[in-house]
Amino acid sequence: SGHRHESXBSTBXASXSSKPCCBHCACTKSIPPQCRCSBLRLNSCHSECKGCICTFSIPAQCICTDTNNFCYEPCKSSHGPBBNN
């Protein structure tokens, strides 16, 4: 049914797992560059995302539509050493 994501408490102190990161980031060659992350995340976007669009599927696939002048660090580096694929 209608879940609503209220993130009033997680804005100031975001947990380490939800810190912003991006594996697929593309920037324009303009100055300053305009960078967008095309990562698909399940059920939510990263903590710094202002414009998050999710599909209505289960689980929801979410993409952040923000345009920044930088890319966040890659998410893959946060996994443990046993996760090498």
From Swiss-Prot:
InterPro entries per record: Bowman-Birk_prot_inh, Prot_inh_BBI
Site (described: Reactive bond for trypsin): 29-30
Residue numbers spanned by region Disordered: 1-20
Residues carrying the site annotation Reactive bond for chymotrypsin: 56-57
Pfam families named in the record: Bowman-Birk_leg
GO molecular function: serine-type endopeptidase inhibitor activity
Disulphide bonds in the chain: 21-75, 22-37, 25-71, 27-35, 45-52, 49-64, 54-62
Keywords: Disulfide bond, Protease inhibitor, Serine protease inhibitor
Annotated Low complexity bias: 8-18
SUPFAM superfamilies: Bowman-Birk inhibitor, BBI
Gene Ontology CC, one term: extracellular region
UniProt family annotation: Belongs to the Bowman-Birk serine protease inhibitor family.
Protein's recorded name: Bowman-Birk type proteinase inhibitor PVI-3(2)
Source organism of this protein record: Phaseolus vulgaris
